[in-house]
A protein has these predicted regions:
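FIC/Doc superfamily catalytic core
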Residues: 3-290
Length: 290
């Protein structure tokens, strides 16, 4: 049985307060088990480690223009490559760099794959501008992020909520019907405004991602890329480096997202993102000689 929550329950799901009734007492048993208590302790230690890493990086601020430029270029290429590769884009890392940095057309690769790389890069530019202006995520900015990803690929659906029902291939849950998407998005933004200051920034960013792509899936296409972008938007606003989900982590990534959607258990996904966030400081240490 697939559980579709009402709007009141939806808001509680995002804060991790509702158990999936189709799974009886399964979530409660996990929460009260010694293993779960150990996992929560591990999460707290991860967050403390991330805060220490951020403080260490903040001590070097302001970073030199050369360091900032190199970090931005490296992040743009790696983030675009991995995020698109997760969705099936076959451009390699070096080909992605050639497209973005040099404007080169890669033989044997489709026009769509080139446009996906360029669109994702433009979306990163937009996120950086939002952060500079200290803007929060809104329905308008969310739709513009999606528009930048798809406007040269599927203009009719870019930046527009889906008008059709969809399935997520291989997932154990079904996104809401198209007619419910606008009200579900209203509930999402209500939760977003209320929850942001009640969680560690990395946990909040991970939950924004999981809730958006799993419970909502509001667009016909491009939901995964949009989710990874808005997750990183929240990390950037909080002063953390960009978290890149590597394509070789895709099986765990999808499995943890599905656990969050079907069991209401966000911990595995939050842990995965927190561990990747630890690794995201490495390019800074390399350039700073630490």
């Amino acid at each position: 049985m697939i559980w579709t929550p009402d709007l009141d329950s939806l808001s509680k799901i995002f804060s991790g307060l509702v158990e999936n009734p189709s799974l009886a007492s399964f979530p409660r048993r996990i929460i009260l088990s010694p293993c779960r208590r150990d996992s929560m302790k591990d999460t707290a230690e991860l967050f403390a480690s991330l805060d220490a890493l951020k403080a260490r990086l903040d001590a070097h601020c302001p970073l030199s223009p050369d360091v900032v430029s190199q970090i931005r270029e490296d992040m743009r290429i790696r983030f675009t490559y991995h995020s698109n590769a997760i969705e099936g884009n076959t451009l390699t890392m070096s080909e992605t760099k050639a497209v973005l940095a040099d404007g080169i057309t890669i033989g044997g690769k489709s026009l769509r794959e080139h446009l996906e790389a360029v669109g994702h890069s433009h979306a990163i530019d937009y996120l950086e501008a939002l952060v500079q202006r200290d803007e929060a995520l809104t329905e308008r900015t969310l739709k513009e992020i999606h528009n930048l990803i798809l406007r040269n690929i599927d203009g009719a659906n870019a930046g527009t909520y889906r008008r059709m029902n969809v399935l997520i291939s291989g997932a154990g849950h079904i996104p809401p019907p198209a007619e419910r998407v606008p009200e579900r998005m209203d509930a999402f933004f209500q939760w977003y405004g209320a929850a942001r200051d009640r969680m560690h920034p990395v946990e909040f960013a991970a939950r924004v991602h999981a809730g958006f792509v799993n419970i909502l899936h509001p667009f016909k296409d491009g939901n995964g890329r949009t989710a990874r972008l808005i997750m990183n938007f929240e990390l950037m606003r909080a002063g953390f480096p960009t978290v890149i989900v590597p394509v070789d982590a895709r099986p765990d990534y999808y499995r943890n997202l599905d656990i969050a959607a079907t069991q209401g258990d966000y911990l595995p996904f939050v842990m995965q993102i927190a561990e990747l966030a630890q690794k995201s400081f490495a390019p800074y240490w390399a350039l700073l000689g630490e």
